[in-house]
Structures are given as C-alpha cells and as structure tokens.
C-alpha cells in the first residue's frame, strides 16, 4: 500500500501483528532485564516470616511469566513471517549473497560515520538494521533455550522436559548449571547493548534523515521525502 502527498510518499510497512509484537517485546525485555539482574544479584537476606518477605519469590515469578510471554510472542512473530507482507520476512532472511546488500551495508556504515551526505531510501530495514535484527532473533532463541533449561531443573511439567537435555549437555562437557546461568546473563548484557544501539539508530534516523522511524512502529506507515539516494546510486 502506498500513499503520496506533495513531495512525501508513504508505504505501509509494519502490519498490526508486527507492531504488537514489537511493543510487547519491549515490555517483556524491560521486565526480564530488571528481574533477571536481581535474580543474579539478589536483594539482601532478611529474617522473618516468608509470607511477608517473599520478595525474591515474586521477582522470580514475574521473570518466569515474562519469559513465557516473550516466547509466545516470538513464536507468533515467526508465524507472521509466513503469512504477512514482504517486510515481515526480511528480518529472517538476510540476503548476504547479494552484492547490492553488501553495497547497502557499506553505504550505511558511511552514513553512520557522517561520511555520506544523504541517507538511503530503504522502505523496510536498512541492511545494517536487518543484520542486527537477525542477530537479535538468534540471541532471543538462545535466551529462551538457556532460560527454560534453568527453569527445567526445578519444574515438574513435561513441556519443559526437553530443555533438561541442555543441562545434561553442560554436565557432559564438564560444566554445570551455573555455566548456563553465566551464558544466560551474558546474553542479557548483549541484548542490553543491542537495545542501546537500536534506540540510538531509530532516534538518529528520525532526526537526521527524511524517514519516519518511531512513528512507523505506531501506525505502520513509513514516509519518505523525495530526493534521497536510491539503491542503484550506492554502487
């Protein structure tokens, strides 16, 4: 879907399920990172009746619940990649075999380093954002696997039983569940670094380019002003 007004053209990029996934993921990640930090570095122990001092228990419950919601919305996002528009699939298929894609990567690097005068005219994600989001999805899967592996150690539900093989794999390699915890926590910091870069790039594009970025994830439309560099000019 495309709309034109004066010298501005708008494309319907992000469908409602994609936008809902994005904002639910933002909420889940905020909850998971805060509660996960305190699980790794618990609050000081206090004596007394656990009924009134069950703070860490509530923190763990919130963390586990947010993790399950995070998993469900990610599965829904993967499903929508099959039934949604072309932009819903671009984050899962990075065309590294295309010369034009690498030309786009190089041009975006120059743009972010203030060496290019004009931004590119990407309707969906630019090549660097596409690669970064693909890496984020891989990290999300890693966090889900390691998180449920840790949860499976004290869960009696059969649905989590397959994740015990992850724990057994770490024991087989000479490690233990603490190693899983360390990798899971490292993943948290890596995702935190990704979030910082993601927010910076979104704000930067909204301010410095003629594209709408933040509002696109609200209403689904990306607007461009004419006169920007095209993909052909990158070469």
Curated annotation (Swiss-Prot):
GO MF terms, alphabetically ordered: electron transfer activity; heme binding; hydrogenase (acceptor) activity; iron ion binding
A biological process term (GO) from this entry: hydrogen metabolic process
Organism field: Escherichia coli (strain K12)
The keyword Metal-binding is annotated on this UniProt entry: yes
Protein role: Probable b-type cytochrome.
Keyword Iron found: yes
Protein name: Probable Ni/Fe-hydrogenase 1 B-type cytochrome subunit
Family: Belongs to the HupC/HyaC/HydC family.
GO cellular component: a single term: plasma membrane
